[in-house]
Amino acid sequence: MSETQNSTSQKAMDEDNKAASQTMPNTQDKNYEDELTQVALALVEDVINYAVKIVEEERNPLKNIKWMTHGEFTVEKGLKQIDEYFSKCVSKKCWAHGVEFVERKDLIHSFLYIYYVHWSISTADLPVARISAGTYFTMKVSKTKPPDAPIVVSYVGDHQALVHRPGMVRFRENWQKNLTDAKYSFMESFPFLFNRV
């Protein structure tokens, strides 16, 4: 009887080993090694990209201000806060900007206060800039939120569709520079239209 049990046990062990060898990948297989290398390289690349992002954010942290609450909001305070935001975010002092209130939209659940920021840069060639770029700011004041809740602020550049939020996206001065450069190039292409006095 012990021989029968041993042979039955041996058969069961052989079947288990065979099943395990079928489910476990063969490490000698070249395809498996290639796939493993690709996965490892992708993982290493992701880790390096994440580390670079962390280092860049430490060198250039996102700059933001403490935005006012619903109870503190006025149109004038909105103008001041946008000025304060840009004084903190814009590093080059050659940019001149002006903020103006555009309109208030009454929605069912909130009010949207829209501001426009004009950007221009003076150069030695053109001490008075003829071209400006712009950024639209929207301050959303909810009718239902408590007075101590912060307002929602977003902005979008001239001729852009992507909406940005202060503190979540870094404001980049080169957006404005690229737009003003493109406008200057366009004006230089058609001098007969733009050189009128």
From Swiss-Prot:
One of its GO terms (molecular function) is protein kinase A regulatory subunit binding. The lineage of its organism: Eukaryota, Metazoa, Chordata, Craniata, Vertebrata. Its main location: cytoplasm. Residues 35-52 are annotated as: RII-binding. Pfam families: AKAP28. It is found in: Cytoplasm. Keywords: Cytoplasm. Present in cilia (at protein level). Expressed in tissues containing axoneme-based organelles (cilia and/or flagella): trachea and testis. Highly expressed in airway cilia. Residues 1-11, 19-29 have a biased composition (Polar residues). The keyword Cytoplasm applies. Binds to type II regulatory subunits of protein kinase A and anchors/targets them. Coiled coil: none annotated. Residues 1-29 are annotated as: Disordered. It comes from the Eukaryota. Binds to type II regulatory subunits (RII). The keyword Nucleotide-binding does not apply. This is A-kinase anchor protein 14. One of its GO terms (cellular component) is cAMP-dependent protein kinase complex.
